[in-house]
């Protein structure tokens, strides 16, 4: 399997878990002299004709490599800023008889933008969750003299980033990196994982006792427009002398406001359930 990551980071290797084979979701439809690429997860009403014969195409390794090279060139010059594809592609590579494109959120809108703005080919198969996965995990924001807080208690729901502060009031040096996770509570009160790109730079930071660390997290609103409500930010640190890993979590809010505020009590009124 040949693999190339469009965004290189710590999680840059594809999963090799023994999962059931996934049927190709790319197929070619011939309508007269025109060949059209479709997706099995897109409903039949989105197709150009009412009835057609769909057949999986098989490509050689050499053909896939040529398509992959062309994909890199087209992606580099594609105009996807502000679309559902912006920040959504985590990688691509040859897998079996197809060129697989991994999406943070494998939505019909993202696939449509890819075909229009980047490449439309029956060789391409899209992988990734079709909806945000449930995630009700919780951790503390304060332990052993280590504290994690949002810089502001509320950010505009249209914001692309949120900032967080890590305070080290312990007697230990703590190590940390770029990786983080975010979950959100939807309108039904169910917590789900926010679809963000989890390819992070492999860098490390040392926070000495008595120091603090300010960092930024991307909210990826182009992939899935965020709603006003409650969000959780997860961040792992390590006591360097003890090699002890600690997962921290802090809550923050997105609200219908123009600028971030430190006290959200007067600007937020969100009903859940």
Locations of regions flagged by a protein language model:
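C-terminal motif of bacterial Sec signal peptides marking the signal peptidase cleavage site
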Residues: 7-9
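Short glycine/threonine-rich beta-strand-turn micro-motifs
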Residues: 21-24, 28-62, 80-115
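Intrinsically disordered, low-complexity Pro/Gly/Ser/Thr-rich segments with frequent PxxP/GP/PP motifs
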Residues: 197-224
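Primarily secretory-pathway and cell-envelope proteins
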Residues: 131-201, 206, 236-273
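A short tyrosine-centered beta-strand micro-motif
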Residues: 212, 227-237
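A mature extracytoplasmic/lumenal domain signature
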Residues: 58, 103-107, 170, 178-180, ...
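Short proline/glycine- and acidic-rich turn/helix-capping motifs at secondary-structure junctions
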Residues: 51-68, 125-136
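Bacterial signal peptide processing site
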Residues: 11-14
């Amino acid at each position: 399997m040949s693999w190339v990551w469009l965004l290189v980071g710590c999680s840059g290797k594809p999963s090799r878990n023994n999962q059931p084979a996934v049927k190709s979701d790319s197929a070619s439809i011939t309508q007269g002299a025109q060949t059209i690429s479709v997706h099995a997860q897109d409903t039949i009403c989105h197709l150009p004709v009412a009835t057609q014969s769909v057949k999986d195409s098989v490509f050689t390794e050499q053909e896939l490599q040529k398509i992959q090279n062309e994909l890199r060139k087209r992606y580099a010059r594609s105009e996807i800023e502000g679309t559902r594809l912006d920040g959504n592609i985590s990688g691509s590579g040859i897998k079996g008889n197809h060129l697989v494109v991994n999406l943070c959120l494998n939505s019909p809108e993202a696939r449509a933008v890819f075909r229009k703005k980047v490449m439309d080919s029956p060789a391409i198969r899209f992988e990734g969750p079709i909806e945000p996965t449930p995630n009700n995990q919780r951790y503390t924001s304060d332990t052993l003299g280590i504290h994690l807080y949002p810089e502001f208690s509320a950010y505009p729901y249209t914001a692309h980033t949120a900032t967080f502060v890590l305070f080290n009031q312990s007697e230990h040096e703590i190590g940390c990196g770029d990786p983080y996770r975010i979950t959100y509570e939807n309108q039904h009160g169910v917590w789900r994982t926010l679809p963000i790109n989890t390819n992070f730079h492999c860098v490390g930071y040392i926070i000495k006792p008595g120091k603090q660390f300010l960092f930024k997290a991307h909210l990826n609103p182009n992939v899935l427009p965020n709603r006003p409500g409650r969000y959780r930010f997860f961040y792992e640190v390590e006591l360097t002398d003890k090699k002890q890993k600690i997962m921290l979590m802090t809550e923050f809010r997105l609200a219908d406001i123009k600028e971030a505020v430190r006290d959200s009590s007067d600007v937020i009124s969100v009903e859940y359930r």
